[in-house]
Structure formats: structure tokens, C-alpha cells
């Protein structure tokens, strides 16, 4: 600091009077550009690759174009400015998530207007936000919940959030889809509401859905749900259309319907506890590294009698705890390394062979119609206490049940028959082999 004192004679150092000191011979400067050398409104110079003098043993730096520059990071800007700039010059890869300013929303603010103007909003930690009207999201939206509570005050069946595919979403890195993170959806009243109806690809990260929600998530354009917790909901997640969904690291507890989807689904590292129907899969999918546990059959919602319909109600069958609906063209889902305890698995008519490899079926029942039980392959499966049953019609007996479509149907009663010829003959196949070995165990 004393070496540059001749450049700033009026500056005081440690409250001492200024003094003038000449730079001695052979004393170099500090080698950095002082900020005062540029005007206040002038931008910092662009650092180009040629100026860095990086080592280039492979001679690849010469092939870089002049527009490949390293620019110093800029400050945050408003989302509205980025949106207007993209409308003017078109999409670019210049903006990223960290460059967008975050708006601090407070309880009582108009969330619909704030989301439209700022897109990236942050809620107060632990605050309670009363939702008195439906919030329509038409463009970009990124909500940082900070464990804030969203409590609805809406009529029965009304949605808290409705994501519409109306406005375009600017090309901002890591903000390409709708995001809800660390939000608690709490429903304490008797009025059942829907948390979110989405017609865009949406991400729900580490959210909690607590209370008697009629439907937590109605996903119509694909979504990803990870690290979420669903408690006491009538239906936790429902997907329609041809879009696929992905659910991982989530917990479903005491829900009448867990995941109901007619399209492709990927479910991994999830836990389903005391759900009347944990999964109803109508299309192809993958279920891996998940747990399905039933602890009681007398308490709600396990005492409910449910069903599912096919062909607009023309064919109705009872609903199992894990239900694979019949499909003419779809194959059986990939079922790998899952744990089932006291679970009833229903299998409709599909193509191929069902092989629950490396899965544990403890005190479970696999129920399937005639002609399907012969397609169950139990090689490499822990099936000591698992029963396989073939279902058939039991006359004209029927009962009315609640269906996955939301209506009630007359469901025929079925007759079950034990089947044992699908098991592996352990007198000929030893268990002291590589049958129960996995390549993933080499890492432990």
C-alpha cells in the first residue's frame, strides 16, 4: 500500500497523515489493475483466451474462434429484463439460474402476479401462506419454499396451482421447467383440494403433502417427483396422456392411491407404507429398489375396497396393492431389487415374462388371471412365503367399489386357486450358486 502512495496522496493509511514516498529503483508494481483505473460506468475488459497464455501441449487453442471468450461474471438482473431481451434478439445461452434475481415473497402477497413478473421467488422460512384463490402459472416459475407452509382456503375439488402451457419460457439455464422445491402443502380442513394441476413438465423436489388432499398432483405433461412425502392423501400422484413420469426417493404413507399412471413410469428408491393401491401401472415402466409394506388391513385406508376399469368401464377388476393393468402391446415392467411385505400383487394380461429379479416377497400374494401365472419366472427371487393364485370368475356375485377413474363400478367377485408349478425346483437347482449374486455387491 505504501508503494502506491504517490498515486493517492490524499488517502490516509491507519489514520496517519499522508506522506509521499517515491518508488525505489528495481521495485516492481503489484501486477494487478486497480479498479480506479476504469470509469464507474465502464465494464470490465473481456479476458480472451489468447491473453491467458494457457499451456497448449496438444495445439488445440489455435482452433478456437474469437467469439469463445471468458467473460467476468455479471450481477443479477430481473427476470422481466431477460424475457424482454429474448423477445428482441431471440434465444441465447447467455443466462443461467444464478443470474436471475430472487424475489422475497411475503404472506399476503399476490403470488400469481409475483410469479408472472419475477418467476424466481423465495418464501419465508416457516411462514404460513393462505391460498384463497387458484394460482395460475402461465410461464416460467421457480419456487424456493424454504419449508414454508401453503394452506388452502378453497372449495372442495379446487386446485391451488394450475400450470398452463400458455406463455413461452425463456432459455435460462437450469430454469427450463416449472419447479416447486421445499414447499409444504398442508390441508387441515375437511374440504379436499388439489395441490397442483400441471400441463407442463414440472419438477417437485423435497415437498411435503400432508392432509386429506383429494388429489395431490395431477400431471398431464410429464413430471419428475423426487424426495417428496405424501401423507394421508386420497390420491398422491396421477398421470394422464402419453408423457412419462419419474418418481424417486419419495415416501407414500397411508394413501388410498399412491401412483396412478397410464403411461410410462420410472419408480426407484421409494417407500410405500399402508397404501391401499401403491402403484397402478397401465403402461410400461421400471420399478427398482423400492419398499412396499402393509402393517394393518383393518384401519383406513387399508379397509377400502377399490377397483380399476379398462375400456371406459367395460372391464372392471379388483385393485391390488400393486396393480399391473392389462395391455395388448406393452411388456411387463422391469421389477428389480424390491421388498414386498404383506402385499397383494395383481398382474393383468401382457406380453413376455414377468421376472422380479433380486426381490423379496415376504408373506405376499401374486394374483393373475388364467394364462398369466405360467409367465411368472421366480429365478433369483426370495419367494419362500409367497403364494401364487390364479383368478377366475365366481358366478354372478358382484360388489360396488371406488375406481381409479373417480367413479364407482360394479366389480365382479373372483375365485382364487393356488398354483405351485411355477416355482423353481430346489432339489435340482442349488441356492449356493450365483443365482442371488449381483454385480453391484462388488463395491461393498
From Swiss-Prot:
The modification Phosphoserine is found at residues 438-439. SUPFAM superfamilies: Pectin lyase-like. Keywords: Early protein, Host cytoplasm, Host nucleus, Host-virus interaction, Modulation of host cell apoptosis by virus, Phosphoprotein. One of its GO terms (cellular component) is host cell nucleus. It is found in: Host nucleus; Host cytoplasm. GO terms for biological process: symbiont-mediated perturbation of host apoptosis; symbiont-mediated perturbation of host ubiquitin-like protein modification. One of its GO terms (molecular function) is ubiquitin-like ligase-substrate adaptor activity. The keyword Phosphoprotein applies. The keyword Phosphoprotein applies. Its main location: host cell. Coiled coil: none annotated. Pfam families: Adeno_E1B_55K. Residues 1-35 are annotated as: Disordered. Contains a PML interaction motif that allows the subnuclear PML localization. Plays a major role to prevent cellular inhibition of viral genome replication. Assembles an SCF-like E3 ubiquitin ligase complex based on the cellular proteins ELOB, ELOC, CUL5 and RBX1, in cooperation with viral E4orf6. This viral RING-type ligase ubiquitinates cellular substrates and targets them to proteasomal degradation: TP53/p53, LIG4, MRE11-RAD50-NBS1 (MRN) complex, ITGA3, DAXX and BLM. E1B-55K probably acts as the substrate-specific adapter of the SCF-like E3 ubiquitin ligase complex. Belongs to the adenoviridae E1B 55 kDa protein family. Interacts with host PML-4 and PML-5; this interaction promotes efficient subnuclear targeting of E1B-55K to PML nuclear bodies. Interacts with E4-ORF3 protein. Interacts with E4-ORF6 protein. This is E1B 55 kDa protein. It comes from Canine adenovirus serotype 2 (strain Toronto A 26-61) (CAdV-2).
